């Protein structure tokens, strides 16, 4: 039976096996179980001897891959993979995945921990960033057969290595340092066309605003190559060693992986985890008080900026030695406000991915949410009322200045319509806070 050897930073963790019937099983290596660095590959796959055969195995590895069937088909075509199944796709592109996971076919020799890369010219960078237009997945152009990465999510993206001021393609199993996100473009729905051609600017703005308001988010920059405009987001699951000679991968997983769920239920409305389940899980965090506070603070931020995609795959935890865990920075933040009107959608259509508690059921419609719904949710969760008041009060006080500070920091060619759309709607919702908490 074919096997993929699973590594974490030069340590052999175990083996993923695909059975004759297509089922996926995983077994931890004895040396990993005995290691002082030992930790579970996923919190849904506890350290144990023997084969793990639960659905969590398939779901964990499947969640390392792009969500889009179209992108998966491109991977099959590009590398002649046997199928869309996680084992077959990761056999081809599992060298650099989300978190610390590296997957290598058992018959391949691996040399650790050599760092190797190829510097990209601007023309080559543009070729990588536009590869998806030629049905090439994740920027893995044909001339770079050694460049094999897996980046989860629904958006067109790739990952690159930054060395000094140069963008580089990593060689072998050298890690990447940045996720590179391309414009989403138009999304056609039955009753609307969502123009997300400025998604790069949108996300950059939202990340700046989040940071200005004290939220833990990754650094990002807008990069250009030829006619391409992309967002380079620094990976928080990577860290240089003290000598800056080796780039380490940091173990992490998203909430679908944590709970052993498939990506098809990442939304609460589809049966996925909501605020209550995640807040209960964060009670076990090594930084429980901080993580629960930050998570609730981020829920308010998502409401204020009209972020409708805060599903389970957009929240993650670092997995530490022994299996302890803590919340990662927040990521994949984009506002729906710029797509309102015209051929887009109406404000009444915007809904949070995770509902808040109301007098009757759950409240998700952004334009129908008020501070009282966060307080009601906090009460149900036994999150201290005084802390929820503090979060709401801080946003009431900080929003106006934060918006001004972000605006003055934007590049001169930044699209004004993105700023206007987000800012005007944030201020409108902020009014609901300032009426109760003041804005001084």
Curated annotation (Swiss-Prot):
Residue positions, PTM Phosphoserine: 150
Documented effect of changing residue 86 to L: High levels of persister cells formed which survive better than wild-type in ampicillin or ciprofloxacin, decreased affinity for HipB-operator
Post-translational modification: Autophosphorylates intermolecularly on Ser-150; phosphorylated form not seen to bind ATP and no longer has kinase activity.
Reactions listed under catalytic activity: L-seryl-[protein] + ATP = O-phospho-L-seryl-[protein] + ADP + H(+); L-threonyl-[protein] + ATP = O-phospho-L-threonyl-[protein] + ADP + H(+)
InterPro entries named in the record: HipA-like_C, HipA_N1, HipA_Ser/Thr_kinase
Pfam families reported in the protein's UniProt record: Couple_hipA, HipA_C
Translocase in keyword set: no
Effect the entry attributes to changing residue 150 to A: No phosphorylation; cells grow normally
Keywords per UniProt: Antibiotic resistance, ATP-binding, DNA-binding, Kinase, Nucleotide-binding, Phosphoprotein, Repressor, Serine/threonine-protein kinase, Toxin-antitoxin system, Transferase
GO terms for biological process, alphabetical: dormancy process; regulation of DNA-templated transcription; regulation of growth; response to antibiotic; single-species biofilm formation
Regulation of this protein's activity per its record: Once phosphorylated no longer has kinase activity.
Entry's family note: Belongs to the HipA Ser/Thr kinase family.
Additional free-text comment from the UniProt record: The hipA7 allele (G22S and D291A) as well as a P86L mutation have been identified in E.coli isolates from human patients with urinary tract infections, showing the mutations may be clinically relevant.
Assembly information from the UniProt record: Forms a HipA(2)HipB(2) heterotetramer which can interact with a single operator on DNA. When 2 operators are present each HipB dimer contacts 1 HipA molecule, which are brought together by the DNA bend and dimerize, blocking the HipA active site and inactivating its toxic activity. Mutations present in allele hipA7 (G22S and D291A) decrease the affinity of HipA for HipB.
Listed name of the protein: Serine/threonine-protein kinase toxin HipA
Naturally occurring in which organism (per UniProt): Escherichia coli (strain K12)
